[in-house]
């Protein structure tokens, strides 16, 4: 996404309020209560009421406005969740998928606030994030690394916390990509995944109303509830209509049902018609399609109403006033190479969150490392890329792995690394302290040469034909580093890699303590070597940002006890996943709500590692399940229409609590997870995540964990009624350490009244 300039208010004079609108999707229509957005609405509508038509058109097309009401200067959008893109003296944070793997509300919020503060201090007003979609419908999706994972509940909480963090830093959150944007292939038509216009139509994501609400709209409810000020409509189609001119999506669902008060702006090439976009819900544009002269014509011939123009103008200013950018305190916008260092102490946060996100999937007492005498390191992912740290990474045409340490995304998800600590550097710093001898092959395929050699035990010469086997032999620990690359512009072509898997097996054949470390953009299969007797541990994570190597080494040596959890299921075979990349113009979401673990559970497919899985260096036990069931509830919500949907959806209607004890010898953090099974009549998945808490517990101590159930957590979408319905009947309660490791279970019964 490019930097876009549009209008912001630099001054406000006392003006009368604008009258309320009466058409669905217009602010103040259908009785949507704005709550704490009311002050922003009064300021924005008063300002717009004093503008001429030409000035309103200037406002929604990105031109400056000078009037008796005050002056407007450019407000900018910029990627993204991982930090400011293409700027000097900024931080490169973990990607959203890594942050979600912490399962830590505080960590998610803290990073968002830190990212937001860097945007604010560089003079940028809008973060193009949170990236609520791609959700992760298919593990082959090229951009799923940018989001919070395929579970709507986890994704929603993370989206909401991210929006709140940006707001508290003083900038406007702009969620993307709305809606059902789940792959790169054919996103611009003609089979391409690039950002340019291919000259033919993009694919259409076709989903039924139940799937739309229970899976893909769900995270946006959370983001809107927590103060979302902008939404980027996707460049693709939904149910046959382009997202940026889709009235059902923008006017009905987003602006009316969810009560979204902010502006909608298009992704690159998301606009194809000014009229269709304007009347159906888009509020801002800067392309030649959305020009002042075009909009004037639409007004003059009656195609575009004055009421809708006013609504667009007001919405362009809602987020600006909501986060108090009108107070004049934000620093002026800086050039990309300006020496304005906004990083503060964020490197510490990045390192901590990176370590929190790493999931220990397997451990045969190999970790933590205990001052190994000889350690060998393998894989390109362990060391730096030859030129760096920043390279212009255009994923289209790139290979499935990265020849260097992969710590940030590509395209819109590529952070500006001020430096990068690869594992090789972090390990070197550690072994100097410990007196360890380290050997390395920083490549995934190794061709020997007569000019390279290895000092071997029992000889005073060097081997003339060294190999992975030579380096692995006589090592106390062998660390094998793997990565998987994808990103904007192209989908994944594989979920495992032959070269890397051969490397693992070769090392393991010659080293009885082979530890595999993976940083990946999505599910990475490992059945090619996971059952090898000498593969003793697997550490698994996403892309961790500038402190990546330090975060990994903190876990390897036990300075941090691992607590990360999977946000996707790792299958045994590619064929175990039910959704592949769609190569046709019509992409039918026939799987419905059955993504990831929901599909595996429904079809009794045994995963290699389940959703929510992650080990620790200590052990935990669960006991004392207690359920405070909901009282009698109305079948449908009866609250007011509000920002974030019907106000009743957010009511706390019940609680589930358990005791978790640390039964091991080390302090550590556990992530107990709550899953619900709905009454049979609701026709829902076997289990759905409906609560989690990351709790730090000292050795020998215990903690009581309480999960609050909101009304929406026990509701499903009633298509005929077009409302969220609470089913009468028995709900099954499961609490455990993953979607398959369920320690405790119970039931509660809900009675509903009409």
Swiss-Prot record:
One GO cellular component term: extracellular region
Signal sequence region: 1-20
Pathway: Glycan metabolism; cellulose degradation
Gene3D superfamilies the record matches: Glycoside hydrolase family 3 C-terminal domain, Glycoside hydrolase, family 3, N-terminal domain, Immunoglobulins
Comp. bias (Gly residues): 188-198
Keywords, in A-Z order: Carbohydrate metabolism, Cellulose degradation, Glycoprotein, Glycosidase, Hydrolase, Polysaccharide degradation, Secreted, Signal
Protein task: Beta-glucosidases are one of a number of cellulolytic enzymes involved in the degradation of cellulosic biomass. Catalyzes the last step releasing glucose from the inhibitory cellobiose.
Name the record gives this protein: Probable beta-glucosidase D
Organism: Aspergillus niger (strain ATCC MYA-4892 / CBS 513.88 / FGSC A1513)
